[in-house]
Amino acid sequence: MKLGLFTLSFLLILNLAMGRFVVEKNNLKVTSPDSIKGIYECAIGNFGVPQYGGTLVGTVVYPKSNQKACKSYSDFDISFKSKPGRLPTFVLIDRGDCYFTLKAWIAQQAGAAAILVADSKAEPLITMDTPEEDKSDADYLQNITIPSALITKTLGDSIKSALSGGDMVNMKLDWTESVPHPDERVEYELWTNSNDECGKKCDTQIEFLKNFKGAAQILEKGGHTQFTPHYITWYCPEAFTLSKQCKSQCINHGRYCAPDPEQDFTKGYDGKDVVVQNLRQACVYRVMNDTGKPWVWWDYVTDFAIRCPMKEKKYTKECADGIIKSLGIDLKKVDKCIGDPEADVENPVLKAEQESQIGKGSRGDVTILPTLVVNNRQYRGKLEKGAVLKAMCSGFQESTEPAICLTEDLETNECLENNGGCWQDKAANITACRDTFRGRLCECPTVQGVKFVGDGYTHCKASGALHCGINNGGCWRESRGGFTYSACVDDHSKDCKCPLGFKGDGVKNCEDVDECKEKTVCQCPECKCKNTWGSYECSCSNGLLYMREHDTCIGSGKVGTTKLSWSFLWILIIGVGVAGLSGYAVYKYRIRSYMDAEIRGIMAQYMPLESQPPNTSGHHMDI
């Protein structure tokens, strides 16, 4: 039975082994010594926590003992912990003799900030993966937090040579471009499985779904992400479709298969049970995605893991249907989507899943469960909420990250220290420093609809029609005795200009102009000038009146002339009024006479009027 299971399983996954696997890479920049300075490619390990979206600078150390890191460094009295003021330590380790993950764990225990595994032979880079469940208890896997990278044998030998020559090797690991970040939305997919009896990997996967659900739903509801779950299936070779093994692991006559959960056909659930539950989860997503609520999928799969485990013999349709109903999902639509697993026909949902397994563009074939793909790049690292969220947040275009990406757990707010080296106006509490997931940006801000312009580092200035509303446009402003003057003008001009009655740069100061002292106003012989803040007062002696527009004093003679002029003006106005009334009276009289004549003419056609003589004319007819 075990041999038959092994043979069939081998045939089922043979097509995947022949698939196109893409090694996810990041850059490694050697900054010293000059002999090996340059940028190199390295492969990201599929464990630990790669610093997606960030960089890590350190000094390389090649231990004199335990160079393959298969034993604890404490046995050799070796520590890689950095001393205060020094760069973190990158440990160079040789490949071979033990698992990659064990090397990383041992180096981390000794204080390493990252490990570089030098390949033992000249070959293309490969992905360092976690060991199979049956080959290692791997209790330490989830505790690995340092990043790891596989480098070529050539680069490894060059680093060793430089270190043996007494050179200090410094380098920078760069993950800023490991995940594409084209726009403000991240598209990601999770290749998962409903099977909960596959050991530690299944336990880790279920734990991740539970922990990540909240963040995933926040991002999806906010329109920040587009999530799609996927499920790996295999087809049974045609020669084996009628075999007992194929019938127990496949549905739809061998088209869609999954391995037996317990690796034993005689007990527990079969592989076909897993395929059906995977299909049900995929259909739940499709139904809810059509209703505009794709995030309900997370509620369903986490509830299913809790309420319908294989260990309690609840991994059934009845248990699943109960959850579907409790979440308000249309059960009929889900059942229609699932179709008949016994029918000799293709299932459109699972057929699409098999086609999606094949890599496109920069994404390789999906061959590992679970697999996370972010912006069409396969994620490498620990399947843990913080690590995955870090990778996803690196997929947003700079300055478009949602708030969840800017928490202290995920990134360091560089604006908190020295304002990130950017411009700021402490009085108005305005800064050009913008915290992003990849680091700070110095960009002049827009505040209350007012755009600031400048380089963002040394200066930013409010501009536009409303710029005076923000810190007075950066211009001078002062109030005294109930009067306020400002050098800011609410138009599209950018310059500060002292108002009339002041002089200065308009930015830091505007000083009152003493018009009296400068003799620019109030200069007539009878004038008496008194300077005020922002203006002046001018009075006249001997009871004269001051005319500001002419800067002169008017005496009594001039007043008499003025009175005469006003008298003439009134006479003229009265004369015009009388002429107007007379004209109106004549007009009314003529109109009335004209109307009387017209009316009399009309009436005369019908009857004799007293003032009209008899009509003596007539018509005669001879008889």
UniProtKB/Swiss-Prot annotation:
Keywords (alphabetical) are:
Calcium, Cytoplasmic vesicle, Disulfide bond, EGF-like domain, Glycoprotein, Golgi apparatus, Membrane, Protein transport, Repeat, Signal, Transmembrane, Transmembrane helix, Transport
Q: Which Pfam families match?
A: PA, VSR_TRX
Residues on Lumenal side:
23-565
Q: Where is this motif: Tyrosine-based internalization motif?
A: 606-609
Q: How does it sit in the membrane?
A: Single-pass type I membrane protein
Q: In which tissues is it expressed?
A: Mostly expressed in roots and dividing cells (at protein level). Also expressed in seeds, seedlings, leaves, stems, flowers, siliques and pollen.
GO terms (BP aspect) = Golgi to vacuole transport; protein targeting to vacuole; vacuolar transport
* Transmembrane spans: 566-586
- For whether the record's keyword set contains Methyltransferase, the answer is no
Q: Which residues are glycosylated?
A: N143, N289, N429
Q: Which GO terms describe its cellular component?
A: clathrin-coated vesicle membrane; cytosol; endoplasmic reticulum; Golgi apparatus; Golgi membrane; late endosome; plasma membrane; trans-Golgi network
List the PANTHER family hit by this protein, alphabetically: PROTEASE-ASSOCIATED DOMAIN-CONTAINING PROTEIN, PROTEASE-ASSOCIATED DOMAIN-CONTAINING PROTEIN 1
What's the protein here called?
Answer: Vacuolar-sorting receptor 1
Entry text on domains? The tyrosine-based internalization signal may be involved in trafficking at the trans Golgi network (TGN).
Q: How does it assemble?
A: Interacts with the N-terminal propeptide of ALEU and the C-terminal part of the 12S globulin CRA1 in a calcium-dependent manner. Binds to EPSIN1.
Q: Which residues form the EGF-like domain?
A: 411-461, 464-511, 512-554
Where, per UniProt, does this protein localize?
A: Membrane; Golgi apparatus membrane; Cytoplasmic vesicle, Clathrin-coated vesicle membrane; Prevacuolar compartment membrane
Q: Which family is it part of?
A: Belongs to the VSR (BP-80) family.
Protein task: Vacuolar-sorting receptor (VSR) involved in clathrin-coated vesicles sorting from Golgi apparatus to vacuoles. Required for the sorting of 12S globulin, 2S albumin and maybe other seed storage proteins to protein storage vacuoles (PSVs) in seeds. May also be implicated in targeting N-terminal propeptide containing proteins to lytic vacuoles.
